[in-house]
């Protein structure tokens, strides 16, 4: 498994480069990311965990090809954060130590969809599995949505460790709701074309995550948490389409690996029709 930079002058960055003959592209002779750099790939967040640091910012606007051996799997782009449009092909944010450290490479997503629908690329998943680096990560389910009053809801979610190793996950019961809502906007939903989302979410900012804010889930274990969220206006009742994003942690390079497992990184987006009562 490797990622090669496409030599300049062959492609324009439009964000929607499709139907490209990958075998016609001239690539750098040496891979930007080689197999020995990769510790694992988490399928639930489409994230490479590395044993080295990789610069991303200097490749802003450049294209890359993900390959397995001699097979070129798909085209992607280092997407500049200043672009007003969104890529329609797999993307990596072209920023160093921004959102993710340089020993984490995460493919971009728009809501529950990864750009280029990388989650539907079976040949990529098979190649990861054949390389022995594929990990299943987590599964997140939105369990319950309760209306406390016209401006506040309690939402309940369940996170299950589908992986083969212990995962460190942010725990709202340990870090507090206001800190949890610094890294996620919680829930929002729609009913009859009317959208409901909290305004001025009460959150507490932070720069580092102490060990005490994590829950450690062994393989097969789960956590169920109920979190309160205020700031809505005139909440409805009945069936709504609800969205929730479970967040990964904030870490620096070299911190993801633990003696007994790893810190889960990324975002797991849930979309579900659910009763608000």
Q: Predicted segments — roles?
A:
Residues 147-149, 157-167:
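Asparagine-centered strand-capping/turn motif at beta-strand->loop junctions
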Residues 1-139, 183, 265, 269-277:
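A structural signal for conserved, well-ordered secondary-structure elements
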Residues 140-143, 208-213, 226-229:
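Short structured motifs
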């Amino acid at each position: 498994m490797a990622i090669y930079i496409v030599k300049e002058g062959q492609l324009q960055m439009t964000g929607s480069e499709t139907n490209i003959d990958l075998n016609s592209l001239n690539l750098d002779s040496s891979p930007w990311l080689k197999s020995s750099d990769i510790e694992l790939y988490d399928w639930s967040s489409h994230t490479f965990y590395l044993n080295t640091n990789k610069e991303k910012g200097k490749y802003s606007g450049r294209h890359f090809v993900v390959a397995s051996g001699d097979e070129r799997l798909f085209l992607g782009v280092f997407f500049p954060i200043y672009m007003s449009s969104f890529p329609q092909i797999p993307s990596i944010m072209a920023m160093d130590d921004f959102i993710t450290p340089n020993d984490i490479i995460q493919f971009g997503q728009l809501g529950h969809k990864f750009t280029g629908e990388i989650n539907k690329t079976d040949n990529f998943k098979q190649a990861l599995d054949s390389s022995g680096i594929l990990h299943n990560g987590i599964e997140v389910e939105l369990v319950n949505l309760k209306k406390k009053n016209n401006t506040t809801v309690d939402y309940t979610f369940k996170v299950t460790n589908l992986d083969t190793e212990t995962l460190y996950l942010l725990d709202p019961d340990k870090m507090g709701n206001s800190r949890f809502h610094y890294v996620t906007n919680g829930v929002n939903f729609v009913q009859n074309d009317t959208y409901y989302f909290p305004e001025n979410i009460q959150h507490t900012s932070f720069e580092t995550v102490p060990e005490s804010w994590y829950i450690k889930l062994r393989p097969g274990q789960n956590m169920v948490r109920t979190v309160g969220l205020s700031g809505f206006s005139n909440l409805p009742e009945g069936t709504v389409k609800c969205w929730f994003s479970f967040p990964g942690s904030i870490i620096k390079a070299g911190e993801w690996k633990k003696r007994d497992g790893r810190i889960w990184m990324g975002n797991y987006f849930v979309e579900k029709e659910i009763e608000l009562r």
